[in-house]
Curated annotation (Swiss-Prot):
Induction: Cell cycle regulated. Up-regulated at the G1/S phase transition and then decreases rapidly as cells progress into S-phase. This is DNA polymerase epsilon subunit B. The gene is DPB2. GO terms for cellular component: epsilon DNA polymerase complex. The keyword Zinc does not apply. Disruption phenotype: Embryonic lethality when homozygous, due to embryo development arrested at one-cell stage.
Length: 526
């Protein structure tokens, strides 16, 4: 009998003795969890899992979703330092490849979790599903908006009360002004098209009044207009689907763990919210573009570490976002052994600050030009070959994906390192509106929050792993979004969400000190 079969039987027996019936997919999740503790011959990890399950799980049937949430919390505790400033239960770090995937069923009007494994190299149908699921996600959100054209659109922009959305296919048989919703594209220069699940239609944006945001290919828009005799839909006003209040989204979908980290009871959420308010001393220090091969940058970084080593309460978390090299780590890059040594040097630098080493956690997120299998999103964590020496010196170091999610008590924070602002501006199909703001960063924040997606660029501009597009969703809208970008540092608060760019540490010596308890952002520089 194989060792895997023996493990399966052993796990099933333990759960049966405690009165639990394990579903097949839950057993697979537990096997993966157990494999992370190869020296655990006595099954203590499984016993710990069962002890925690008895405290939170009321049903005798155990499914994959319940197990996954519990395992994420336990692994967060396992990876935490012994005496951190922030307890393991307060801070969970969720890799993009572990984010639960949900698809919307428009017939049953509910979300279904995808529990089977997701291949990195998906079939062609996965690409089609990517667009369909993005559209369905926003469509069900809009369906809850009593007046979806407000406040996303100015009240004076439309004189009509009927805001019902028509399918594009039905435009052929209808007259008068209609609202449609679809994915915008440009199949040929100067010719724009709008497509929903029923059909596509050419649209004329020459007379359209648009709202704030970057209108790029792949973005989903709401448009009011009228069908012309030439078969072109003349757009009068258009904008993004209106943003939904986070609390309203949670009320509609309280049973789903969209963010990752496990679902919580109402009592647990109240308790965590209270603890979060009390955690006034917790600080996250966020730096982007830390070029380890640049001596001047390393001297500046040591100055930052020296400063925080001497404060009364050291930061609970340091977030180091790439790029970690001044040159792109592409096929022509031949200095990987040198880069490995530089990560080791960074580990020794952190180790020279004993209070930070013992009490802070260090999260590393790769940048768009860092070493990795490809530039496709989401990006996996930095290769272990590069970080091995640093890991040995700093046990509190965590290497995660890009994007990466962090849960601080109840607060949901998304980190994304991508030079998104420049690429979104360059990919615009129409000139952004200047009526509400001329600030490009505000246009960017408006776009990604209304699209509920971190990177709504065309796939030809920024490839995405089709089966993991859900890892870039911003649904429900998180409390905080950190957009690591080489552009100037900036902060923007919009729709209940705090969004900021820490700037480029290597170029401008800028970074951010973030206090999650109050969502206060301190833009800093040397």
């Amino acid at each position: 009998m194989s060792s895997t079969s023996q493990k399966r039987k052993k796990i099933q027996k333990k759960f049966k003795n405690r009165g639990y019936n394990l579903k097949f997919d839950a057993l697979d999740e537990i096997l993966v969890f157990a494999d992370q503790f190869p020296d655990d011959d006595d099954g203590e990890a499984i016993d710990l899992l069962l002890d925690n399950l008895q405290e939170t799980h009321k049903s005798s049937t155990v499914d994959a979703e319940s197990v996954r949430g519990l395992i994420n919390r336990l692994l967060g505790a396992h990876n935490a330092p012994e005496e951190p400033t922030t307890s393991a239960s307060s801070l969970a770090i969720i890799d993009a490849f572990l984010v639960p995937k949900f698809g919307y069923d428009s017939v049953k009007k509910k979300f279904n979790e995808h529990t089977s494994s997701l291949p990195i190299h998906g079939e062609a149908s996965a690409k089609t599903a990517l667009y369909r699921e993005r559209f369905m996600l926003l469509s069900q959100r809009v369906s809850r908006a009593e007046h979806f054209s407000r406040p996303a659109f100015d009240a004076e922009m439309s004189q009509f009360e009927n805001n019902e959305i028509s399918s594009i296919q039905s435009l052929i048989s209808q007259r008068g002004r209609k609202w449609v919703m679809g994915v915008i594209s440009q199949l040929e220069d100067g010719h724009f098209y709008l497509e929903d699940l029923s059909a596509s239609v050419e649209i004329d944006l020459s007379k359209a009044k648009i709202t704030t945001g970057f209108f790029t290919e792949n973005t989903i828009i709401l448009a009011e207009g009228e069908m012309q005799v030439n078969g072109i839909f003349q757009v009068i006003t258009c904008g993004f689907p209106p943003l939904e209040d986070r609390d309203k989204t949670l009320k509609a979908h309280s049973e789903y763990d969209f963010f990752g980290g496990g679902t919580l009871t109402k009592e647990e959420m109240i308790k965590l919210a209270d603890l979060e308010r009390q955690a006034v001393n917790d600080t996250f220090v966020i730096l982007s573009d830390i070029w380890l091969d640049d001596e001047e940058v390393m001297r500046k970084l040591e100055t930052v570490l020296d400063g925080f080593e001497s404060v009364e309460t050291v930061p609970s978390l340091f977030v180091f976002m790439g790029n970690f090299c001044s040159r792109p780590c592409n096929l022509s890059f031949g200095s990987y052994s040198s880069l490995r040594e530089q990560f080791g040097k960074l580990g020794r630098m952190i180790g020279n600050h004993p209070r930070l080493k013992e009490n802070s956690r260090f999260l590393f997120i790769p940048g768009p030009e860092d070493a990795g299998p490809s530039t496709v999103l989401p990006r996996c964590a930095l290769p272990k070959y590069l970080t091995e020496e640093l890991r040995n010196i700093i046990p509190n170091a965590i290497f995660s994906s890009n994007p990466c999610r962090v849960k601080f008590y109840n607060q949901e924070i998304v980190f994304f390192r991508q030079d998104l602002l420049y690429r979104m501006r360059r990919s615009c199909l129409v000139t952004p509106s200047s009526e509400e703001t001329n600030d490009p960063f505000k246009h960017l924040v408006y776009t990604i929050t209304h699209q509920s997606h971190l990177c709504p660029l065309p796939l030809m501009v920024q490839p995405i792993i089709w089966n993991y597009d859900h890892a870039l969703r911003l649904y429900p809208t998180p409390h905080t979004i950190v957009l690591g970008d080489k552009s100037e540092q900036e902060v923007c608060k919009f729709g209940g969400t705090t969004c900021f760019n820490p700037g480029s540490f290597s170029t401008d010596s800028t970074f951010v000190a973030y206090r999650p308890s109050t969502q206060e952002v301190e833009l800093s520089a040397l």
